[in-house]
Regions:
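PRPP-associated nucleotide enzymes
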Residues: 1-176
């Protein structure tokens, strides 16, 4: 019998030279073709988050796919964190640095209440920049990030280093 990590690793597809030459892209979309495996993934995240969170925030866009299911199973609200200009007001925004430039994310400022314990979910942890910006956004709203969860951790990019100042509870199901 395979472990969940082995099943995930067998399902994720390496795409060579995407999105640019020299990059090996970890394509998680085949996970969504297997409903049984997807349920196992969601259940694994739920088990790690039980009793620890009041809200699940999903990062646009692949953080929405399992994030909403995690929230539903935990019976807590699901909040979208989106690129700037995609949510109606009132919003709070947070900018962060990219390799070449900046990006900005937003959340509806009414949805994260003071003292809320927040799980931030996304598909892949790379440099940690987006997740770090999300945690700063949660703080601006008065919440506290109590857990991060990712399907994949690209450990060679050291993304966890940017997140441990918010919480050391960082759940990943596999790493490369």
């Amino acid at each position: 019998m395979s472990t969940l990590q082995e099943k995930i690793n067998q399902t994720i597809v390496d795409v060579i030279d995407f999105p640019i030459e020299g990059i090996v892209y970890k394509d998680i979309t085949p996970l969504f073709l297997n409903s049984e495996l997807s349920n196992e993934i969601v259940d694994a995240f739920v088990e790690k988050a039980k009793g620890k969170v009041d809200i699940v925030c999903g990062i646009e866009s692949r953080g929405f796919l399992y994030g909403i299911q995690i929230a539903q199973k935990l019976k807590v609200p699901f909040v979208l964190i989106r690129k700037a200009g995609k949510l109606p007001p009132p919003t709070i925004s947070q900018s962060y640095d990219l390799e070449y430039g900046q990006a900005t994310i937003e959340v509806n400022s009414n949805y994260i209440k003071d003292g809320a314990r927040v799980l931030i979910h996304d598909d892949v942890l790379a440099t940690g920049g987006t997740a770090e910006a999300c945690a700063k956004l949660v703080e601006k709203c008065g919440g506290k990030t109590t857990q991060f969860s990712f399907i994949v951790d690209l450990t060679f990019l050291h993304g966890k280093d940017k997140l441990t100042s918010f919480t050391t509870d960082i759940v990943t199901l596999t790493e490369y």
